[in-house]
């Protein structure tokens, strides 16, 4: 390991000011930390332009992305198994391809025949989306360089491995290095890269935390497997807001955007029902009508308050505020 020696400037300055580190003669040139300095540019001298966006063809996805995909952007989307991530991206790739943009779908979890069968089930006939069933990073990068797609999907990043590392696919080192190579490729070529990520039992994205810091946008695709409705939200977006949500409905022909999500959050009563009220909440720029239903039974000496979808401590605080300041006693 080469050693650095400290050289003092003339004039007798022996403190930190005036001292510098000098590379000793004979130091190998292969060390990045000893590379020559690069020219710098003042921030005010850099020309900044608005980011151009390309609509994905799915309005609800575009709403969350901020208007569409960005050239050279890297998007990470995670969700539970079977929630519809691959279906969503396959539909988006087909819409982009039909609009005239070349696309590439790299699958590491399914064979080409399985993806083709799913596309036919979704009613995507005659799709010209380029498909590659591969998990080796070097082959994926070579294919991207040859095909030159505008948008490339990697499904999923946990299945990709590099021959430069000896660890197994899905390990922390493999996920970190493969994502870093794909990110550098996207920034240098202007190709939009969408990475599909696995989630843990707790619902967090699997793999190193640096993966979320590395990409430009992090999306979560969530929903109840017993319900046909799905929500997509952004928790990080360098090119747009993070408080927007998109609503989809899973049908036999794939995911369909829900233009009026308030209708699915309200029960259809012909007349007012006791214990039910409707309130308005704002998700990003979209106002939503939601229905709150309360079931109150005669309690014993120590009644319990239970809630579904709302933290019980927050519920207790809200009831205390209503009791103290609004005079609403939510009790027997």
Please provide the spans of the model-predicted regions.
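Structural recognition of the conserved hydrophobic beta-strand(s) that form the central parallel beta-sheet
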Residues: 105-107, 130-132, 153-154, 191-198, ...
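Phosphate-binding/switch loop-helix module in NTP-utilizing enzymes
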Residues: 131-190
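Short hinge/gating elements
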Residues: 45-48, 79, 102, 162-169, ...
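N-terminal juxtadomain amphipathic helix
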Residues: 1-43
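Phosphate-binding/switch region of NTP-binding enzymes
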Residues: 180-270
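Flexible beta-alpha connector loops of hexameric P-loop NTPases
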Residues: 50-52, 78, 104-107, 125-134, ...
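Conserved P-loop NTPase/AAA+ ATPase motor core
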Residues: 245-246, 252-332
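The Walker A/P-loop phosphate-binding site
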Residues: 25-122, 141, 145
């Amino acid at each position: 390991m080469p050693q650095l020696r400290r050289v003092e400037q003339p004039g007798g300055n022996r403190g930190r000011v005036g001292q510098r580190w000098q590379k000793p003669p004979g130091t190998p040139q292969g060390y990045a930390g000893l590379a020559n300095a690069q020219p710098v540019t003042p921030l005010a001298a850099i020309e900044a332009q608005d980011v151009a966006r390309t609509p994905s063809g799915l309005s609800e996805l575009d709403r969350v992305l901020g208007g569409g995909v960005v050239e050279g952007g890297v998007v990470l989307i995670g969700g539970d198994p079977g929630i519809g991530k691959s279906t969503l991206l396959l539909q988006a790739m087909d819409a982009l391809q039909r609009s005239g943009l070349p696309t590439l779908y790299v699958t590491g979890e399914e064979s080409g025949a399985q993806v083709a069968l799913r596309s036919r089930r979704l009613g995507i006939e005659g799709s010209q989306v380029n498909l590659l069933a591969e998990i080796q990073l070097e082959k994926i990068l070579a294919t991207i360089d040859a095909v030159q797609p505008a948008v490339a999907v990697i499904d999923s990043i946990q299945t990709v491995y590099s021959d430069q590392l000896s660890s197994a696919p899905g390990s922390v080192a493999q996920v970190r290095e493969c994502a870093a190579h794909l990110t550098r490729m996207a920034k240098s070529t202007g190709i939009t890269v969408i990475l599909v990520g696995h989630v843990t039992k707790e619902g967090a994205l699997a793999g190193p935390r640096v993966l979320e810091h590395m990409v430009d946008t992090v999306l979560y695709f969530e929903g109840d497997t017993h319900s046909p409705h799905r929500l997509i939200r952004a928790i990080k977006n360098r090119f747009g807001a993070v408080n927007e949500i998109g609503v989809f409905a899973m049908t036999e022909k794939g995911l369909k955007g829900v233009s009026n999500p308030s209708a699915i959050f309200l029960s259809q009563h012909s007349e007012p029902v006791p214990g039910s009220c409707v309130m308005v909440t704002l998700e990003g720029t979209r106002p939503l009508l939601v229905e709150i239903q309360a079931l109150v039974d005669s309690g014993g000496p120590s009644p319990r308050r239970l809630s579904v979808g709302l933290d019980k401590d927050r519920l207790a605080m809200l009831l205390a505020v209503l009791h103290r300041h609004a005079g609403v006693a939510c009790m027997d």
